[in-house]
Every structure is written in C-alpha cells, then in structure tokens.
C-alpha cells in the first residue's frame, strides 16, 4: 500500500517480484476517493518503465461515472480491467478485460468471467449493454450526477458541522462525515 500521489515511495517498494500495480479508479470502500487523472498517468509511466502490469479495478464504478470506464477521461490504457456490478444490473456477473499483451498468457480455462457460462447472466449482461449504448446514456448519467451533487452540497451546506465533503463522479457519490458514521447507521 502507498498514499496516492507518493510516486517516489511507490517506485522504491516495487521489486523484481512485483507483477502489477492494481488500483480502484474510484475507491468505493475507501470513501469514494477519486484517483486523479495525473496520478493514473504517472502509474502508467511507472508500470511501463518497470515492465509491470497496470490493473485498473472498475468493479464498482464502470458505467456509473458518465463514461464507460472511470479511467477513460485520463487517457490511460490499463493492461487489465476487472468489471462487475454495473455490467449485471444487479444480477451476479463479472468479467476480466485484458489487452493483447496480457491475452497471450491466457490459455483455455483461464478465469475471465464470473457466471460467464450462465445463459441468464449473459442475457442480463447483453440487456444492460443495450441500455448503456443507447444514445445519451452517459450524458444522462452526468446530468443526473450533477443534480445529485448539487443536492448533496445543499445538505452539506445546511449541516457543516456534520458533513465535511461531497465526493464522487457521475452517480457514484459519498459524503465525508465529521462525526462517527456509526451514529447514522444505528438510526437506519
């Protein structure tokens, strides 16, 4: 583990046994922390220089940010992209997308999909992709995300001693609280 942006430390902890750097483009469980584009670009440079893979985990954020993948706006091309959640529209489905360099090492039987042989999962995935590829889908995600962001900012402004920050991109949003989250969870 390393603090994002501390690329000098990262370079020092990479050894000859390091195969890849893997990061969530938006850290979901880590507090909806968006990895800045400059950071993703630097990670790509480091991986290229060290001849290791860059894995950008899109399990939680793919299709939900206003673009197909959250990393797209950075211009970075990862070697491996795990996806799930959004691709199944709530139905269990996941996949592992790889570039040509990585695909050479994948032989028959290599794990590339969760529920991939399940006809229902594949039908659901196809239906989700049909919706995602509809005209203006991503524009609508951005528009609704802005509306959501504005609403959350109003709540933050109303409760400045409780809410520190509104985070997120598109429809992935989170609030950084100034009070213990357990208080709110208990009241649910």
Spell out what each predicted region is.
Residues 1-188:
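Conserved N-terminal phosphate-binding loop of PLP-dependent enzymes in the Aspartate aminotransferase
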């Amino acid at each position: 583990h390393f603090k994002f942006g501390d690329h000098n430390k990262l370079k020092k902890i990479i050894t000859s046994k390091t195969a890849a750097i893997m990061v969530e483009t938006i850290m979901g469980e880590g507090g909806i922390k968006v990895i800045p584009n400059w950071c993703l670009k630097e990670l790509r440079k480091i991986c290229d220089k060290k001849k290791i893979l860059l894995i950008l985990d899109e399990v939680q954020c793919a299709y939900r940010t206003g673009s197909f993948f959250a990393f797209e706006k950075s211009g970075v091309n990862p070697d491996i992209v795990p996806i799930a959640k959004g691709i199944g529209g709530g139905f269990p489905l996941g996949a592992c997308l790889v570039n040509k360099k990585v695909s050479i090492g994948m032989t028959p039987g290599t794990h590339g999909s969760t529920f991939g042989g399940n006809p229902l999962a594949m039908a659901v995935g196809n239906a989700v992709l049909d919706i995602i590829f509809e005209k203006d889908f991503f524009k609508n995600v951005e528009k609704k995300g802005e509306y959501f962001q504005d609403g959350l900012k109003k709540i933050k402004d109303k409760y400045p001693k409780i809410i520190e920050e509104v985070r997120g991109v598109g429809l992935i949003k989170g609030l950084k609280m100034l009070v213990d989250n357990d208080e709110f969870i208990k009241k649910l």
